[in-house]
Curated annotation (Swiss-Prot):
The keyword Cell membrane applies. Keywords: Cell inner membrane, Cell membrane, Membrane, Transferase, Transmembrane, Transmembrane helix. It is an enzyme of class 2 (transferase). It comes from the Bacteria. Its EC number is 2.5.1.145. This is Phosphatidylglycerol--prolipoprotein diacylglyceryl transferase. The chain crosses the membrane at residues 17-37, 59-79, 94-114, 129-149, 204-224, 230-250, 265-285. Pfam families: LGT (PF01790).
Length: 300
């Protein structure tokens, strides 16, 4: 078993200014977007569509606005609507935390639709272009979660070699022991808690960093290197992220104020299901549309 090292959330101090690790992760995500975006503009089928570095800069600006506004509103509406409707001014306290990926995703979609309209492009053409770079941002975000010691995983077996104890989760650990008293004794978890005053948990932030971040980036980047029908790369992103996130949620601790919902699924899983279905539908539509186009050309 491992113990979370409890990193200082502040990476460095510049006079009165505190630079936090999580902020640096956002910066890393933006830099990787520009770096891999420029590599993508050099791919022949992408260059043929006229993408330039200027487009990347503009899309990053709109994307940042979409992530921040959508992520915050998504958290407010999906996770704690009762609280924020009763305390509306707290919506603006973003420094206290509270961002939702699914909300940020919708925010980016809206931002890219506006950008596409301004540039006279199809919004699917825009989302197909940016989709392969998005997992880089996901990886950076999950690494930031791990450094902050937040969004930890569910209680795991003490025999799991990479299980990790999170000092910040001690309150949730006690709640788990109260509701699983018999299981805690038979599994040896009570003995672990008696010794360390913490319970071993899945380091789900690392699972998500490796899954929906690193592995998903590699797979989607390789898929998008070749010309694909319009909408296919966007559909592959929705399907892939939805599957990775749905699977990771089985190891991630549900939000304390929500718990598990219908069918013992978490909010993250319920929000991922539509992404999976829409992703499949987009892939089917995309390839059928491309196939029909080839048939029409053959009969012309």
């Amino acid at each position: 078993m491992l113990i979370h090292p409890q990193f200082d959330p502040v990476a460095l101090h510049l006079g009165p200014l505190a630079i936090r690790w999580y902020g640096l992760m956002y910066l890393a995500a933006f830099i990787m977007f520009l770096w891999f975006g420029r590599l993508r503009t050099r791919q022949p089928h992408i260059a043929a569509e006229g993408w330039t570095g200027r487009d990347l800069d503009d899309m990053l600006f709109y994307g940042v606005l979409g992530v921040i506004l959508g992520g915050r509103l998504g958290y407010v509406l999906f996770y704690k609507p009762d609280w924020y409707f009763a305390h509306p001014l707290d919506i603006f306290k973003v420094w206290e935390g509270g961002m939702a990926f699914h909300g940020g995703f919708l925010g980016v979609v809206v931002a890219m639709m506006l950008y596409a309209r301004m540039r006279g492009r199809s919004w699917m053409q825009v989302t197909d272009f940016i989709a392969p770079m998005v997992p880089c941002g996901l990886a950076a975000g999950r690494l930031g979660n791990f450094i902050n010691g937040e969004l930890w995983g569910r209680v795991s077996s003490p025999n799991l070699p990479w299980s990790m104890m999170f000092p910040q989760a001690q309150g949730e650990d006690r709640e788990w022991l109260l509701s699983h008293a018999q299981e805690a004794v038979t599994s040896g978890l009570q003995a672990v808690f008696d010794q360390y005053h913490m319970l071993p948990r899945h380091p789900s932030q690392i699972y998500q960093f490796l899954g929906e971040g690193v592995l998903f980036f590699i797979l989607l980047w390789l898929y998008a290197r070749k010309p694909r029908p319009m909408g296919a790369v966007s559909g592959a992103f929705l399907l892939g992220y939805g599957v990775f996130r749905f699977a990771a949620e089985f190891a991630r601790e549900p939000d304390n104020f929500l718990g598990l919902l219908a069918a013992n699924l978490s909010m993250g899983q319920w929000l991922s299901l539509p992404m999976i279905l829409i992703g499949i539908a987009m892939l089917v539509w995309s390839y059928r549309r491309a196939g029909n186009g080839e048939k029409n050309q053959a009969h012309a």
